[in-house]
C-alpha cells in the first residue's frame, strides 16, 4: 500500500510530524522498530519534560487548564523568556548549535505545546523536580516547568492514541532497512515487519528515529 507520508520512528518528534501531516490531509503511516510495550525511542525513557517560553501563569494555564486557583496561589512559576531560552541553548551547546534552528525552536516553543494540547496531550507542572519551597510557596527554577502526564511513557501513549483517533496507522515491530529511490527521489521504504520483508511506497519519508 502507498502513503502520502511514511514516518520512521514513533517518539515525540516522529508522532508530531505524523500528526502535522495528517492535519493537512495526508495519508500517514508510522513505522516503529520496537514492540508497542517498548516503542517510542528516547521519548519513552525521558521524564516527558518540554522546555517552553512563557510570560507567567496565564500562559501556563493555556497549556495546563487543570491548574487550580489554589495551586497558583501557592506557586511562583516565574517566567522563561526567549532570551533565557536562547542563552540556555548556547550555553549547553557551547555555541555549537545551528542559530537558525534554535530560533525556530525558541520562537515556536509555546505555540507548539498549545498545538500538542489541542491534539490531546496533557501537561502538568514539574512540582517534584523543578520547584522548591520558600516561605510556604513553591518556587520554580531553571526554566523547565512543564511535563507530559505520565512522563515519557505517558507522552508516547498519548501521542499514539491521538494518532489512532485521526486514522494514522502505526506499525510496531517494523524496522526500516533502506529507502527506495528513483534517481534522486525517495519513493518509499524497505521494511522488515514481524520477520517479513515489505516495500512501502510514499510521496514523502520523514526519518525521526535517531534521537
Where do the protein language model's features map onto the residues?
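Gly/Ala-rich phosphate-binding loop of Rossmann-like dinucleotide-binding domains
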Residues: 18, 22
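Glycine-rich FAD pyrophosphate-binding loop
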Residues: 23-43
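N-terminal glycine-rich dinucleotide-binding loop that anchors FAD/FMN and/or NAD(P) in oxidoreductases
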Residues: 44-80
